[in-house]
Amino acid sequence: MGSGPVPRVGGVRLPALIPLPGAAPLSAAVPAEMAPAAVPAAGAPLVTIVLGTRPEAIKLAPVILAFQADPAFRTRVVLTGQHREMVSQVMELFGLRADHDLALMAPKQTLTHITCAALEGLKQDFAGHRPDLVLVQGDTTTAFASALAAFYEQIPVGHVEAGLRTDNLFDPFPEEANRRLISQLAQLHFAPTEVSAANCRASGVIGEVLTTGNTVIDALLLMAQQAPVYEVPGLDWQRQRVILATVHRRENWGERLSQIGTGFLELLERFPDTALLLPLHRNPTVREPLQAMLGSHPRAFLTEPLDYDQLVAAMRGSTLVLTDSGGLQEEAPALGKPVLVLRRTTERPEAVSAGTARLIGTASADIVAEASLLLTDGTAYEAMARAHNPFGDGQASGRIVEAARRFLGIAGG
C-alpha cells in the first residue's frame, strides 16, 4: 500500500436537490478580451455555429464568445433543440443567446427523427442566412446532421474536437460513426491533441488539420473564475469524501447500468466516510433504474443535472470522479481529480496515457476494486491527481478564430 488514505476535500458546497435553481449569467467572469464586440459590418463573413446538446453548448460557448469578440465576423448561433432545457441553462450561464431554435425536441425521439428534422430545418435556415462557414462540435447526431446539411448546400464545415476515435464503430454508438462521417465532410479539422490530429490525417481527410487544444478547458477556466457556494442537504463536504459520478451513455443501458449501480452501493458500504453525488440524466432509461437502486441510501445524493458552474464546483470539491462522460475525462484532470472511466473503450487515450484517467469498465467488482485503491492508497491517488492534463491551455477558441480568418481570407487579427 502507499502513503495512507486519501484526505477529505472540503471547502465547496453543492446545490440543493431536485429541482436545482437556475444559474446566474457569467457576465462578470468573461474576460474583457472575450466580451462581445460592436456589431460588425453587414458584409462581414457569416459563421453559423450549430449545437443541440449540453456538452456541445459547454464546449462551443467559448468559441461563440471568441467569434463575437472579433468584428471581422458575423456570428449566428442555431440550436436544434436536441436537449433544449440543458442547453438553455448553459447558454444563460455564459450570457449567450440563440439566433434561431429549430425546436426539434420530441418525446422519445429517435436518431432518425433528429437527423431528418435537423436536415430540413437547417436547409431552411441556411437558405435565409447563408453562412460562409458552419461550425459543429464533437460527435452528436446534431453535429453530424449539421455537417451533412452544410455539405448539401456546399458550405464549408469546421469540425471542433475532430479526430477522436475508438476504432469500434458501435462503441460508443452512434458517436464513433458520427465523428468519422463528419471528418469526411469537413474542410477545417480542429483537433484537441496531436493524437487526434494524427487520427484525422490517417483517415485521409480533405482540408486543414490543426491542433488547437480542447475548448472544454477554455470553458472550464472561464467558469473557474466564479466561486459558487452551494449546499446539498445532508452532504458534509468537510467530513465526507465525495465521489462525483455521472452515467448516461447508450452502451451502458440495461445490465451494465445495473452493474454500475451495484458498484456504487458496494463502495458506500465499504467506506462509511464516503458519499456519492450522482446528477441524474433526464432520460428515464438511465434515471429510473439508478433511482430505484440508490434513491434510499442515506449517503447517495441524487440530483437533477447540474448547471455547468455547479458541476465545476462539484469537481473541485470531490475526491474522485467516476463517469462514462467524455467531457469529464478532460475537465476533471485540469482540477487535479482522478477519473475512473465506466467504459471499455475511450476516444481520449491521451488521458489514459498521461495517467489522469483509467478505463475500468462497468463490472461492479472492477468499480469497487479500482475506486478502493484510490480511496486507500495515497501514492496511487497522487500519481493520478498530479499527472499532466494533455487537453490544452485554455487558448483553443482563439486558435479556431485565427484559423477561420485564414480560411476565409481575412487579413490581420
Functional labels for PLM-detected ranges:
Residues 42, 125-132, 237-238, 271, ...:
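Glycine-rich phosphate-binding loop signature in dinucleotide/nucleotide-binding domains
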Residues 3, 7, 14-81:
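N-terminal subdomain of nucleotide-sugar transferases
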Residues 88-90, 109, 226-317:
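Donor-nucleotide binding loops and adjacent catalytic segments primarily
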Residues 11, 18, 30-33, 39, ...:
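C-terminal amphipathic helix plus adjacent low-complexity
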Residues 136-137, 159-162, 189, 313-352:
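A donor-sugar binding/catalytic signature common to diverse glycosyltransferases
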Residues 80-85, 182-255, 360, 380, ...:
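A nucleotide-sugar donor-handling region in carbohydrate enzymes
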Residues 48-51, 56-66, 90, 101-204:
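Active-site and donor-binding regions of nucleotide-sugar-utilizing enzymes
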